[in-house]
């Protein structure tokens, strides 16, 4: 006669059958990674990163926000692009703080911290601070800006409590491979003393940037290295000979892509040794109205385990709002 299964065995079978169902309701086993980065967009083993130009939250943009709100700065096409990407890196062209610290420079900007959550809501994940306006409210304003960015759920890049921290490469992803961002301001700061032991933005020389790239490449031959450089001449369309030389030196030692801003214009784009160099991608959310300042682009990187597809997406800025070209 066949023996009846024991009660203990029956209980074990029931538990095995019910466990996946219970987990799906309880959330146990969820790694708490942002859903944006763990959904089907990674199913094809592709990491999508979008990089924008200058994002200003003062002057004419402040007036626009006062009239229509921060959410209105994001057109439907931009919203769709950002939310279909894993990461979005924008160059924040102002401190965002309640601190007002006297500085001596021509253009002084400041945004409101309460506006930052809207940037995160619309898909921005990282804000680059290695530029000539992050110090517009002094060192205390710079430190507070970093904290406000973190509170809003984003990650600041290119600034720190000292130069060593400000210049440290940022690992933004390990899937499908390690992706590093190295950011630097390649211009002198107006009436702002270089004090490397004090809060500051990254102002690494090309030789120092080369050392960062060489170190990253030596540690991981297959990593992806993106450089964000705030450099060049404002309101010019061509890169300088020095920029071209510097960019090629960085590619020669292992950089995979270089994206620049500061010019407020769309500048030279070239490919060197199969690697893209965007010397200046122009503005993003900005109040300059001249045609030369209203044409820009965003850059989309689609990174897999062994290659990267780079896409140039032209935009037009109308009344501070960027629109993707149709």
Annotated model-derived regions:
Residues 62-76, 109-110, 173-225, 322-326:
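Binuclear metal-dependent hydrolase catalytic cores centered on His/Asp/Glu-rich metal-binding motifs
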